[in-house]
Amino acid sequence: LGFCSGSKGDPIFQEDFGSGNGTGNPLAAGVTNYTYVVGDPQDGQYTISDQISQQINTWHNALPNTTASNGRALVVNADYTAGLFYQTPISGLCENASYEFSAYLMNIFNSSTGACPGTGIPINVRFEIWNATDTQLLKQGSTGDIAGSSNAFWEQYAMTFQSQAGQNSIILKMFNNSDGGCGNDLAIDDIIFRSCGDLTTISPINSSENEISICEENLPQTINLEANPDFSIYSDHYYQWQRSNDGETWNDIPGANQAQFSTSSISTDTYFRVQVAEDPVNLDDNLCSTFSEAFYVEVIPTPPTPSS
């Protein structure tokens, strides 16, 4: 397992199991092979809730609000046989694009109760990615053992994946990779699948500045900018420069598709950013590419001439 070390796009898929207090609705048929219950689940069962340790007093008595969504979670009492915690199909992938599959996990056994030897049977979750027909395992990775603790805490785990030419759909899966018994009880939250790309900065050529201020009396001016990807993910780089007057609404600059870019004459406050993809076709989809932080060009007004 490992995180995207570059820039992360908006989630293509996110499962946060809902908000609100108490127990939520069961998962759709086929999502898990565990059995839904209201209240604390026993071996082979699960619930959707923001509350745990209602009947089982060896669990932590609350889920910490430290995930992305801070709502309900999938709470599972893992079985003696390896079971499927969760699966979902993902469509709309771009070809030759990098992605990150992540989730927050928590061992809910409270080791300070002493109910199990040591820290109890650890939880261990296997992440898998399958092709759209569920016939070929494309990638897998395991968290390793996550021991019970006297303190309740979430920890995020992730796996990266690169789609192939013509591949636009996959299936995400999460499996029990440990043994049933005293322990191996867990909560899962915020399962996210998102694009992953290089972290790219913009600077003037031969400079490291991330913004420029220009006095109004020196206008108009042209600035030579350069995109600086960190090469953490992409092996090839394709660019589309954009500009904005407010830093929120962006427009493509026709023909600006190289790492270096010379602005047209600037006469007012302007923002620039660059969209980066590993395949040129992915520049047409914001979910399959990444964006740099904005580069700001500030125009400083000329102060009024003092009156005599």
Where are the regions a protein language model picked out?
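Extracellular interdomain linker/stem segments of modular secreted and single-pass surface proteins
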Residues: 194-201, 293-306
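Aromatic (Trp/Tyr/Phe) and Gly/Pro-enriched flexible surface segments
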Residues: 2-94, 105-108, 114-126, 133, ...
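Exposed beta-strand face motif in extracellular beta-rich ectodomains
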Residues: 99, 168-170, 268-272
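A short beta-strand segment in extracellular, disulfide-stabilized domains
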Residues: 219-229
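Solvent-exposed loop segments of extracellular immunoglobulin-like
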Residues: 229-243
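Surface-exposed, flexible coil segments in extracellular/virion-facing regions
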Residues: 242-265
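Short, solvent-exposed loop/turn segments at the edges of extracellular beta-sandwich modules
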Residues: 179-182, 277-288
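Conserved Ser/Thr-centered positions that define the repeating blades of beta-propeller domains
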Residues: 242-244, 273-277
